Every structure is written in structure tokens, then in C-alpha cells.
């Protein structure tokens, strides 16, 4: 039956079983011999021994993946969240990421807005009477309609682009002065129509025929 040799204690164990090896490694003499062995050798040699032991364990098993490290080709975190360790934070909203479509090549800094390669965002369409990219100016008291706000629509029955001509213009009859034929005075208070003809009372019923109202 094969035996296990301990390099630290320089002895052979009785059996090469896991239970016997664990019992020997937990012993007081074995632990003291391990400490003395690493104290005798130099620091550089001790580090090389530790690296060799670590590499042997890594060769036998697979490395545990780190959840913080994203695999190649993964999407970056959304805007507003910090980047993963070893990864640049996401660019601000409206700027393409490096290496993407219409973006800067990897390793190049992001140009500022308006610089070479990244134009300013398009301005808002200019308002009537306002500057390009700005808000419409407020109307003033002596400013005619249409400077900053749409004009007042014409009265009903006229086309949208119709302009009312001044009095006495060609093609339109002149307005008669008050008291002339064709001029209808404005109705008095409480009347919604033209004045009643003479001979009628205030009532809406017609008066008696002539001759009936005379005394006999």
C-alpha cells in the first residue's frame, strides 16, 4: 500500500488516505514545521512557491466568473447608472458612444458640442416675427397685429385674405351721412328692430279701422 511523504516533517505516513493526511496536517508538529520552513527560505522564494501552488489549483479547476465584469460585446449600463469596474461610464444623453455608429473611434475623447465632428443640436423653428432659435417677441401697445402673433381673422362671410377697404374706395358705395335716405338710425334702448310705422300703438295688435273710434 503506498505511503504519503510529508516534505515539511520529512516523514512517511502510515496510510495515503485523506483522513490520515488531514489528521497529520492538523497536528501541532506539522504546523510548526511549516512555519519554520517558510521562515528559512527568502521572501522571493516564498512568493514563487505560493504562486506555483495557486497556479496548480487554477489549472485543475475553472476560474469563478466575476459578476461585476461584463463579457466582451455586452451593452453598457443605461444612462444615469455608474459603469462597471474597468469600464467607462455611459456618455451623456444625445452623444453616441465611442466605437458605435457615427461615434468616435475607441480611445478618442468625446468632442464638445459644436466642435469638429459633433455639431450643435438643431435649434427650434423660428416663430413669426422672432429670431431664429428663439421665442416669439411679446406684442407691444403700438405694434400692429401680426408682429409676433397671428393676425386677427376677418369677419364672417369674407375670405381669409380679404382686406376691408377704407370708406369711399372704388367699387364700393359710399356710406350716407346721418339723416339722409338710406341711412337707418340705430334703434333705441330696449328695441331690437326698426321703429314701427306711424299710427300703430305700442302694442303688437293693429289699431281699430277709421270711423269706429269716433263718438256718435
Swiss-Prot record:
Signal sequence extent: none
Family named by the database record: Belongs to the U1 small nuclear ribonucleoprotein C family.
Entry keywords, A to Z: Metal-binding, Nucleus, Ribonucleoprotein, RNA-binding, Zinc, Zinc-finger
UniProt entry tagged with the keyword RNA-binding: yes
Record-level GO BP terms: mRNA 5'-splice site recognition; spliceosomal snRNP assembly
Zinc finger (Matrin-type): 4-36
Pfam families, alphabetized: zf-U1 (PF06220)
Quaternary organization: U1 snRNP is composed of the 7 core Sm proteins B/B', D1, D2, D3, E, F and G that assemble in a heptameric protein ring on the Sm site of the small nuclear RNA to form the core snRNP, and at least 3 U1 snRNP-specific proteins U1-70K, U1-A and U1-C. U1-C interacts with U1 snRNA and the 5' splice-site region of the pre-mRNA.
Organism: Aspergillus fumigatus (strain ATCC MYA-4609 / CBS 101355 / FGSC A1100 / Af293) (Neosartorya fumigata)
One GO term describing the cellular component: U1 snRNP
Function: Component of the spliceosomal U1 snRNP, which is essential for recognition of the pre-mRNA 5' splice-site and the subsequent assembly of the spliceosome. U1-C is directly involved in initial 5' splice-site recognition for both constitutive and regulated alternative splicing. The interaction with the 5' splice-site seems to precede base-pairing between the pre-mRNA and the U1 snRNA. Stimulates commitment or early (E) complex formation by stabilizing the base pairing of the 5' end of the U1 snRNA and the 5' splice-site region.
Residue ranges, annotated region (Disordered): 68-216
GO molecular function: mRNA binding; pre-mRNA 5'-splice site binding; U1 snRNA binding; zinc ion binding
SUPFAM superfamilies reported for this sequence: beta-beta-alpha zinc fingers (SSF57667)
Protein name, entry field: U1 small nuclear ribonucleoprotein C
Record's subcellular location: Nucleus
Coarse class of the protein's main subcellular location: nucleus
InterPro entries, per database record: Matrin/U1-C_Znf_C2H2 (IPR000690), Matrin/U1-like-C_Znf_C2H2 (IPR003604), U1-CZ_Znf_C2H2 (IPR013085), U1_snRNP-C (IPR017340), Znf_C2H2_sf (IPR036236)
Biased composition range(s): Pro residues: 68-80, 87-198, 206-216
Amino acid at each position: 500500500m503506498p505511503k504519503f511523504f510529508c516534505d515539511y516533517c520529512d516523514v512517511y505516513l502510515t496510510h495515503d488516505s485523506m483522513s490520515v493526511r488531514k489528521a497529520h496536517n492538523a497536528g501541532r508538529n506539522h504546523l510548526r514545521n511549516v512555519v519554520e520552513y517558510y521562515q528559512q527560505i527568502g521572501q522571493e522564494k516564498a512568493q514563487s512557491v505560493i504562486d506555483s501552488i495557486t497556479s496548480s489549483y487554477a489549472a485543475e479547476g475553472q476560474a469563478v466568473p466575476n459578476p461585476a465584469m461584463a463579457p466582451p460585446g455586452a451593452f453598457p449600463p443605461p444612462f444615469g447608472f455608474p459603469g462597471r469596474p474597468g469600464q467607462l461610464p455611459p456618455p451623456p444623453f444625445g452623444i453616441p458612444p465611442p466605437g458605435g455608429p457615427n461615434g468616435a473611434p475607441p480611445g478618442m475623447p468625446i468632442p464638445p458640442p459644436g466642435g469638429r465632428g459633433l455639431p450643435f443640436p438643431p435649434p427650434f423653428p423660428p416663430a413669426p416675427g422672432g429670431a431664429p432659435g428663439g421665442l416669439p417677441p411679446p406684442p407691444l401697445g403700438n405694434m400692429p397685429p401680426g408682429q409676433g402673433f397671428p393676425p386677427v381673422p376677418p369677419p364672417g362671410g369674407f375670405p381669409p385674405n380679404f382686406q376691408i377697404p377704407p370708406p369711399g374706395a372704388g367699387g364700393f358705395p359710399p356710406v350716407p351721412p346721418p339723416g339722409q335716405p338710406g341711412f337707418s338710425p340705430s334703434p333705441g334702448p330696449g328695441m331690437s328692430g326698426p321703429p314701427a310705422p306711424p299710427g300703430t300703438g305700442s302694442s303688437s295688435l293693429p289699431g281699430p279701422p277709421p270711423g269706429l273710434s269716433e263718438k256718435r
